[in-house]
Amino acid sequence: MSEAGEATTGGTTLPQAAADAPAAAPPDPAPKSPAASGAPQAPAPAALLAGSPGGDAAPGPAPASSAPAGGEDAEKKVLATKVLGTVKWFNVRNGYGFINRNDTKEDVFVHQTAIKKNNPRKYLRSVGDGETVEFDVVEGEKGAEAANVTGPDGVPVEGSRYAADRRRYRRGYYGRRRGPPRNYAGEEEEEGSGSSEGFEPPAADGQFSGARNQLRRPQYRPPYRQRRFPPYHVGQTFDRRSRVFPHPNRMQAGEIGEMKDGVPEGTQLQAHRNPTYRPRFRRGPARPRPAPAIGEAEDKENQQAANGPNQPSARRGFRRPYNYRRRSRPLNAVSQDGKETKAGEAPTENPAPATEQSSAE
């Protein structure tokens, strides 16, 4: 009985223990080596193998969930490709407009960032009103939008006429050193007329013709130290030839002008090189005063005699107007005659007392 009871109890307890074993297995998983289990196992991700610097393993499902969200934002659903349409209107300042599809007559929103090939001459991306363009239709937040906008067959778009053009850069304008202009009109004539040693201008047959040949600058240029004229002196009205300093090689026979005081005539007219220089006003030589007429000299003597020695004489250098002098000549002549008679009488009266005194003695 005891053996049978033990057998029965053992038989009843074994199935219960076996039933409890699978229930307790999940919460306590034992690590098993790959060699122990015959089933192949998937390789662990690199993030789990490497782990974080703190020793904790990085969570695996987080990157998988974020990747689809970023892909949805980056890529929009394409509804149609290579669709032709006509620009309904486009605002250059705001940077958006609408394109009317030729196939479905539907208005599609277009932004300036969707323009793939812009006009290279335009500064801003834009499409012109009524222009035919080719684009892709994608699904946007508020409806259909245009993407990859180009001209027909992938050519650049024409752009709006209200869009600003790019600045035209002239060749050599910014790279040119600041200094005097290359040549003046007056210098061209002098350089063409004169002859210099060792300078033979190359023949330009067939290279330029007509007006272009006239506008072409000569090959020879004087040294920089002799071309220090600012460029804004080109349009002034004074004679530019007087400011040109002759080249030493040009001072040959036939080119040297008349010598005045050991200096060529052309160098006497040269102005100061400083554009802000203003020469001081120099008073010229005193003009020779004309000799006074006989009548005027007598008139002055009579005036001094009438005024007496105590009265100051008239201010030296005083000149009467020319018209007044001409009008007063006949009057002066009459007065001179009267004064001359008085002057003649005075000396005759003076010697009379002298004779009387001599006789009395």
UniProtKB/Swiss-Prot annotation:
Its GO CC terms? cytoplasm; cytosol; gap junction; nucleus; synapse
Biased-composition ranges, Low complexity, are 1-23, 33-71
- Residues with the Phosphoserine modification: 2, 33, 52, 126, 193, 195-196, 313, 335, 358-359
Keyword Repressor listed? The answer is: yes
* Main location group: cytoplasm
Alphabetized, the UniProt keywords read: Acetylation, Cytoplasm, DNA-binding, Methylation, Nucleus, Phosphoprotein, Repressor, RNA-binding, Transcription, Transcription regulation
Function recorded in the entry: Binds to the GM-CSF promoter. Seems to act as a repressor. Also binds to full-length mRNA and to short RNA sequences containing the consensus site 5'-UCCAUCA-3'. May have a role in translation repression.
Please describe the quaternary structure of this protein: Found in a mRNP complex with YBX2. Interacts with RRP1B.
| Name of protein | Y-box-binding protein 3
- Which species expresses this protein natively? Mus musculus
> Could you read off the lineage of the organism from its UniProt record?
Eukaryota, Metazoa, Chordata, Craniata, Vertebrata
